[in-house]
């Protein structure tokens, strides 16, 4: 498992895999790290899925809805930086909430 999907809590595996495919592994990990930090994990947001990140995500009980919210924020920030991508935002938003 190149992306270490199996090392994550079961309820986050599908969305993490989808983030790896659509946003790249590093960005997907950063979203998980930010979601864990919102619950007090204190992780460095570096995009690396090492033992500290895996443990913190499990121990902080990161909820799927929290990950979805951070994923939506990523897309909103991307469109703010690159307004020409706004035409894709609604589809990205829907996907972020449905996966």
Language model regions located:
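Low-complexity, Gly/Ser/Thr/Pro-rich intrinsically disordered linker/tail segments
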Residues: 60-99
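Short acidic, glycine/serine/threonine-rich helix-capping segments at coil-helix boundaries
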Residues: 5-17, 21-69
């Amino acid at each position: 498992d190149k992306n270490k999907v199996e090392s994550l809590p079961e309820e986050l595996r599908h969305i993490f895999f989808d983030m790896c495919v659509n946003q790249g592994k590093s960005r997907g990990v950063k979203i998980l790290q930010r979601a864990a930090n919102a619950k007090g994990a204190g992780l460095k947001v570096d995009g690396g899925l090492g033992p500290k990140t895996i443990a913190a995500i499990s121990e902080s009980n990161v909820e799927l809805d929290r990950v979805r919210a951070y994923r939506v924020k990523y897309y909103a920030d991307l469109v703010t930086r690159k307004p020409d991508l706004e035409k894709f935002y609604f589809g990205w938003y829907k996907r972020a909430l449905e996966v």
